[in-house]
Amino acid sequence: MVWRTLGASNFSTCPNGSVQWIWDVFGECAQDGWDEASVGLGLVSILCFAASTFPQYIKACKTGNMDQALSLWFLLGWIGGDSCNLIGSFLADQLPLQTYTAVYYVLADLMMLTLYFHYKFKKRPSPLSAPINSVLLFILGTVCITPLLSSTDPVAVPREGFRGRTLLSVEPGNKPFTKKEVIGFVIGSASSLLYLLSRLPQIRTNFIRQSTQGISYSLFALVMLGNTLYGLSVLLKNPEVGQSEGSYLLHHLPWLVGSLGVLLLDTIISIQFLVYRSHETAAASEREPLLPS
């Protein structure tokens, strides 16, 4: 594995030692149980984010109304946030594993966007427009990402701490922000803002439709779980040597806001699922014919 060759050179910089495989794979200096728990939660959060879109793919194929159920601005905001993470993974010299994970998230978002336009164009008169435009959209996104992926340089670089879906990070320490840190902080803030703003159009769409039909709740449930675990993984990690807790939280503030802050909006969407589904169940029971006496 490419990222495995990057860990041996600076293992001595870990003051109290580290779990070897955690250092080899992530370059993370896991000094105690808190750091190990942080890495474990981060890994589970990645699995949650990676699996979150599959239920929506299945739901879209079953219902065929994804273009009505999901807000386009929700999808664009989501892919915008993940794209910022992808850009930041290159600017901040992230590990190849983290970069490939960021690429996967963007490709998963492109697949969601492809399904959206597939069902939107499918309603047009030309029967060929839907598959052609969907395939072209996915190919275009893949072509745009492939040069970035192929340009990943496997030369050893300063190692960042382990991250979940939000891959951007900055150097530890109490010193003022460097230019590189400022760029990462700005991109991370933009990413968090896009994640937050993306929920508002979806909440509005659900409210206007008074329905959540066509949306898989597993999409939001897994994202909520992933964001919770990621936020906890950041909070559980020990600050670096010589770094205060306040400095650590300040350096990671945008990503904490992007993960834990969005939970409030996802909770609102969860409430919409409960309310509108109860209405739909009641309406369906009213439409059932009365049994003959």
Swiss-Prot record:
Localization: Lysosome membrane
Q: In which tissues is it expressed?
A: Ubiquitously expressed.
Cytoplasmic membrane side? 59-71, 118-127, 204-214, 276-293
- Per the record, the major location class is membrane
In terms of SMART domains, this protein maps to:
CTNS (SM00679)
Question: Does this UniProt record's set of keywords contain Nucleotidyltransferase?
Answer: no
InterPro entries, from UniProt?
LAAT-1, PQ-loop_rpt
Show the stretches that span the lipid bilayer: 38-58, 72-92, 97-117, 128-148, 183-203, 215-235, 255-275
- Any idea which UniProt keywords this protein has? Amino-acid transport, Glycoprotein, Lysosome, Membrane, Repeat, Transmembrane, Transmembrane helix, Transport
Q: Name one GO molecular function term.
A: L-histidine transmembrane transporter activity
Under the heading Pfam families, the entry gives: PQ-loop
According to its UniProt entry, one GO biological process term is: intracellular amino acid homeostasis
Q: Which residues does the entry place in the Lumenal compartment?
A: 1-37, 93-96, 149-182, 236-254
- Residues with an annotated glycan are N10, N16
Sorted alphabetically, the Gene Ontology cellular component annotations on this record are: lysosomal membrane; organelle membrane
Q: Where is this motif: Di-leucine motif?
A: 290-291
Q: Which Gene3D superfamilies match?
A: 1.20.1280.290
For the PQ-loop domain, which residue ranges apply? 34-100, 191-243
Tell me the superkingdom of the source: Eukaryota
Topology versus the membrane, per the UniProt entry? Answer: Multi-pass membrane protein
Q: What does this protein do?
A: Amino acid transporter that specifically mediates the pH-dependent export of the cationic amino acids arginine, histidine and lysine from lysosomes.
Entry comment, domain topic: The di-leucine motif mediates lysosomal localization.
Recorded family membership: Belongs to the laat-1 family.
Q: What is this protein called?
A: Lysosomal amino acid transporter 1 homolog
Q: Which organism is this entry from?
A: Mus musculus (Mouse)
